[in-house]
Every structure is written in C-alpha cells, then in structure tokens.
Curated annotation (Swiss-Prot):
Protein family membership: Belongs to the 4-hydroxy-2-oxovalerate aldolase family.
Organism: Albidiferax ferrireducens (strain ATCC BAA-621 / DSM 15236 / T118)
Active-site residues annotated for this sequence: 20
Domain of life of the native organism: Bacteria
EC number: 4.1.3.39
Protein name: 4-hydroxy-2-oxovalerate aldolase
Span of domain Pyruvate carboxyltransferase: 8-260
Listed SUPFAM superfamilies: Aldolase, post-HMGL domain-like
Matching PANTHER family: 2-ISOPROPYLMALATE SYNTHASE 1, CHLOROPLASTIC-RELATED, HOMOCITRATE SYNTHASE-RELATED
GO molecular function, one term: 2-isopropylmalate synthase activity
Pfam families documented for this protein: DmpG_comm (PF07836), HMGL-like (PF00682)
Length: 342
C-alpha cells in the first residue's frame, strides 16, 4: 500500500524499555529531562514504568531506583501535549496497579502476554476499557507463533475490549518478510476500527526496516526509543525512524531536529554502556531470545565462566520466554557443571 500522507502515532519506549539497560535505575531528574524533551519534540505517547511494567520491582526482575508511582507522578504533570502509557504484564502487574495508573493520569494501558497466552489478559483488558482507557493488547515474542495463531490471539484480545493490538518482536528476530506477512494477516482479521501496532528491537539491525514494513502493512502505531535506548541492542531508534518517515511522506508530527537533540544531548549521556549490536545482542536476534535477557546472561557469564552468547543460544534452544529470568542462572550453572568443577 502507498504510505505517502499516512499519519501514524509514534510511541516512545525510552523511559520503559530503556529501563532494562539502565538496570531500572533511572533518576527522577533523568525521567523529567527525557519526558519534557520528547514532549517538546512532538512525541504524542510516552511509556513510563519499570522495564517489566507495573509491579515489576522484584528480586526476579530488579528493584528500580523509584516506584512506578513516583516515576508516573513526576512525569505526567510536566507534559503539555504528550500522553503517558504504562505496560502491564498479567502475573507481574495487577488490577490494583492498573487502577493506580489510571488515578495518576495514565492514558494508555498496554496489557502484554506471550503471543500464545492472550487468554490471561481478559481481566486486565476488560477493566481498562471499563475505566475508559486507551487499551492495547501486546503480543510478545511474535516470532514464536505463525500468522493464524497470532490472528486467534489478537481476536481474543480484541474481544476482551482492546482497541489496538501490537505485534511485538521482543527478540529482534523477525525479518521484513515475516513482519509483512504477520502484520498484514492480523490487520485483515481485526475490525477496521481496531488499530494495529508494531514494536521492534534492533538486534539484527532490522528495527527501522521492520517498522516501515509494518506501516506499509497497515500498522498505525510504532514503538521506538530515543537513541534506541532499550533492551538488547535497543529498540527502533526514534530519530532514525522519524527521518525515514519524513523521506517517505509518513506523517508523525515529530520534529526531527528536536528528536535528534533529545537522543544526542540527553539520552546518550545517560547510557551506562553503548547501546549497540555487540556479539551478545546479535545472538538475541539470531537465536530468537527475549531481549531483556541480555544483562542477565552477561551477569551469569561473570559468575559461572560460560560466555553470555553460549548461554543465550542455550536459552533459545530451550525456548525460554519473558518471565523465566530466574532460569537463566540455572541454565548457566548447568552448562558450567557440564564442563567440570565451578
């Protein structure tokens, strides 16, 4: 389809997915600087929570520098135009977290499940719609299901009340042909008024290309992050995606120069390490492994002497998915024992 003149909503991930490489330790001042910069650049929707969503603070996922309430309560009053979203993964976040987010002024709730487990989202999606929130069903690790399975899961979320469904490439594994096939199939199966979104990771350097293909296939919401700050090799870099959209005539409403300045002047100096496709991040995309596993694997490498990329390959072989972070150390320990005394 032609995309010239098409208007899309870009959704910034810097303050949520970007929490993963920051080990959830963003300060309130960093949150404020990024959020107000994005708002001034014209970004319409900004996600703010622990990297694993509302309620993510735990031994399993990591304790943040501040609570979700503190982050949201700090950012939301500062924004002039942008709205704020929050991620909620059933089993981590609860309906109480959802109500808290609504009370604080969160506009959009994104209820995320593994791509074959949409049935666990009914309670949260239904409540979000009752609360008159913009309600998104977020199908993670979408490379793990074929188009027909994704259609059935998307329709479940739609039936619960979701007004937008996301195809989520959590591993940065998908290539443009697969994105086209799956987004086109799901778009055709949903009601016309239900929006379609795409969330990419840059582990195989496909974030921008996959996002463009998703727009060409009917997606109207695209996730990206300033300077790509996100799990693994990062999310689709927002400033690059905006530049490509400008070239293609896709309307985003985002000022390219201001977006570049947020990325270069605010986000890059915040990074604890460069967000790039290093050998371990590359393996995430190559083996189809959940992007937020990266730092867990790097920590296990130091503890057990097994290389992070070998651990990630093993996690891919086992088919491990988001929520199984506690099994990463177990896998590394098993691999180390197989090689001899630790």
């Amino acid at each position: 389809m032609t995309v010239k003149g098409k208007r899309i909503t870009v959704h910034d991930m810097t303050l949520r997915d970007g929490m993963h490489p920051k080990r959830h330790q963003m300060t309130l001042d960093q949150m404020k600087a990024v959020a107000t910069g994005l708002d001034a650049a014209g970004v319409p929707l900004i996600e703010v929570t622990h990297g694993d969503g509302l309620g993510g603070a735990s031994v399993n996922y990591g304790f943040p520098a501040h609570t979700d309430e503190e982050y949201l309560g700090t950012v939301i009053p500062l924004l002039k135009l942008a709205k704020v979203s929050a991620l909620l993964i059933p089993g981590i976040g609860t309906v109480d977290h959802l109500r808290m987010a609504k009370d604080l002024g969160v506009h959009t709730i994104r209820v995320a499940t593994h791509c074959t487990e949409a049935d666990v989202s009914e309670q949260h999606i239904s409540l979000a719609r009752q609360l008159e929130m913009d309600t998104v069903g977020f199908l993670m690790m979408a490379h793990k299901a074929d188009s027909q399975r994704l259609i059935s899961q998307a329709r479940l979320m739609e039936s619960y009340g979701a007004n937008c469904i996301y195809i989520t490439d959590s591993a940065g594994y998908m290539l443009p042909a697969e994105v086209k096939e799956k987004t086109s199939a799901v778009r055709a199966a949903l009601r016309p008024e239900t929006e379609l979104g795409f969330h990419g990771h840059h582990n195989l350097a496909m974030g921008v290309a996959n996002s463009v293909v998703a727009v060409e296939s009917g997606a109207t919401r695209i996730d990206a992050a300033a300077a790509g700050l996100g799990a693994g090799a990062g999310n689709t870099p927002m400033e690059v995606f905006i530049a490509v959209c400008n070239r293609m005539g896709i309307a985003t409403g985002v000022d390219l120069f201001k977006m570049q300045d947020v990325a270069e002047d605010i986000v890059v100096p915040m990074m604890d390490h460069p967000i790039r496709i290093d050998r371990d991040a590359l393996i995430l995309g190559y083996a189809g492994v959940y992007s937020s596993f990266l730092l867990f694997a790097k920590r296990a490498e130091k503890k057990y002497g097994v290389s992070a990329r070998e651990i990630l390959i093993e996690l891919g072989r086992r088919g491990m998915v988001g929520g199984q972070e506690d099994m990463i150390e177990d896998a590394a320990m098993t691999m180390a024992k197989a090689r001899g005394p630790i």
